[in-house]
């Protein structure tokens, strides 16, 4: 065991040194103690059209027994593009089990960006969008948030080996329409982050959902042994919507569940009303399927306590 640990440490050191030599300043150390690194990758070194940031954490048992944990950050990387690229990276890992994989990942991402630049797909700044920027919205991912996200993933582990895990049942909520925009929630029980990917893949098989302007999601998984949660969210281009939806789920104490809200933009900006509709869709489907009973019971208990205190 000790020999394997030493081998992993040495191979990680050698890999990081090689990547630093190859990519120079593009390769950045976020937290050396936590083994968190990032690199900005573009389709061209001269006038890049497509750029994204790959952030990784190297677990103690990488590369011998587990993959790097990773996060892809780019405002334009959404929906099917994100899933396609993630699937490519994970398939590449499975084809090279036990090997150092970061260089291959970086070059695969670069190849993906070059292919996008050579298609008729316009650059990210030219794409039509329904994004409505609010003052105070924070689109950047802080180092603390990134570290916490990675640690959460490490607590539960990423399941690359189980290809037989069943896709949880997905239910669909009622639609809400306002000024030609339509919103609809989709809900599924989840007990692992791996199931989140399965659910997204399944939803994107539906062409209507796949072509939604935004598919915002949030999930919370309760880890009883640690009395803690694995939780995350995705705006999918609708700035801050994912965080707001996750906050709602925290208030409702929703556990072991994922909610995706699809928005089909109708050409008229809704302003703050869009957040109200997104959260109402999420709240309605959570209540309909009894994922906020704990909060309701707690509220009733609090109400009873207040009445009792008033009588005294």
From Swiss-Prot:
Query: For the RWD domain, which residue ranges apply?
Result: 14-116
CDD domains listed in its UniProt record: RWD_IMPACT
Recorded coiled-coil stretches: none
Cytoplasm is among the record's keywords? yes
Q: Which Pfam families match?
A: RWD, UPF0029
Q: Where in the cell is it found?
A: Cytoplasm
Q: Which GO terms describe its molecular function?
A: protein sequestering activity
List, in alphabetical order, the GO biological process terms annotated in this UniProt record: cellular response to amino acid starvation; GCN2-mediated signaling; intracellular signal transduction; negative regulation of transcription by RNA polymerase II; neuron projection extension; positive regulation of neuron differentiation; regulation of cytoplasmic translational initiation in response to stress; regulation of translational initiation
Determine the domain of life of the protein's source: Eukaryota
Polar residues bias: start-end ranges = 118-128
Question: Sorted alphabetically, which InterPro entries does this protein's record hold?
Answer: Impact, Impact_N, Impact_N_sf, Ribosomal_Su5_D2-typ_SF, RWD_dom, UBQ-conjugating_enzyme/RWD
Where would you say this protein principally sits, based on its record? Answer: cytoplasm
Assembly state and interactors? Interacts with GCN1; prevents the interaction of GCN1 with EIF2AK4/GCN2 and inhibits EIF2AK4/GCN2 kinase activity. Interaction with RPL39; this interaction occurs in a GCN1-independent manner. Associates with ribosomes; this interaction occurs in a GCN1-independent manner. Associates with actin; this interaction occurs in a GCN1-independent manner.
Which family is annotated? Answer: Belongs to the IMPACT family.
Other facts noted in the record for this chain = In contrast to the mouse or rabbit ortholog, the IMPACT locus is not imprinted in Xenopus.
Q: What is this protein called?
A: Protein IMPACT
């Amino acid at each position: 065991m000790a020999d394997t640990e030493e081998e992993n440490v040495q191979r990680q050191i050698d890999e990081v040194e090689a990547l630093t030599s190859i990519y120079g300043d593009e390769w950045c150390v976020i937290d050396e103690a936590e083994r968190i690194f990032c690199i900005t990758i573009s389709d061209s070194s001269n006038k890049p059209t497509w750029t994204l940031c790959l952030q990784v954490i190297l677990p103690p048992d990488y590369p011998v027994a587990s993959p790097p944990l990773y996060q892809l950050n780019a405002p334009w990387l959404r929906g099917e593009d994100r899933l396609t690229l993630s699937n490519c990276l994970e398939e590449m890992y499975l084809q090279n089990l036990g090997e150092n994989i970061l260089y291959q990942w970086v070059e695969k991402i670069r190849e993906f960006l070059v292919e996008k630049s050579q298609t008729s797909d316009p650059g990210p700044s030219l794409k039509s969008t329904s994004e409505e920027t609010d003052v105070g919205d924070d689109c950047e991912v802080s180092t603390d948030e990134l570290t916490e996200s990675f640690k959460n993933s490490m607590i539960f582990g990423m399941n690359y080996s189980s290809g037989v895990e069943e896709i949880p049942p997905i239910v669909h909520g009622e639609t809400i329409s306002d000024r030609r925009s339509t919103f609809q929630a989709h809900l599924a029980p989840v007990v692992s982050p791996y199931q989140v990917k399965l659910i997204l893949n399944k939803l994107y098989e539906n062409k209507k959902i796949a072509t939604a302007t935004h598919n915002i999601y949030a999930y919370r998984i309760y880890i009883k042994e640690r009395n803690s949660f694995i939780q995350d969210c995705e705006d999918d281009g609708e700035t801050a919507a994912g965080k707001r939806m996750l906050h709602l789920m925290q208030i409702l104490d929703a556990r072991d569940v994922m909610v995706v809200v699809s928005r089909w933009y109708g050409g008229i900006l809704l302003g703050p009303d869009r957040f109200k509709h997104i959260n109402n869709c999420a709240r309605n489907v959570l209540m309909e399927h009894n994922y906020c009973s704990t909060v309701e019971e707690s509220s009733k208990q609090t109400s009873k306590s207040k009445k009792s205190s008033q009588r005294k």
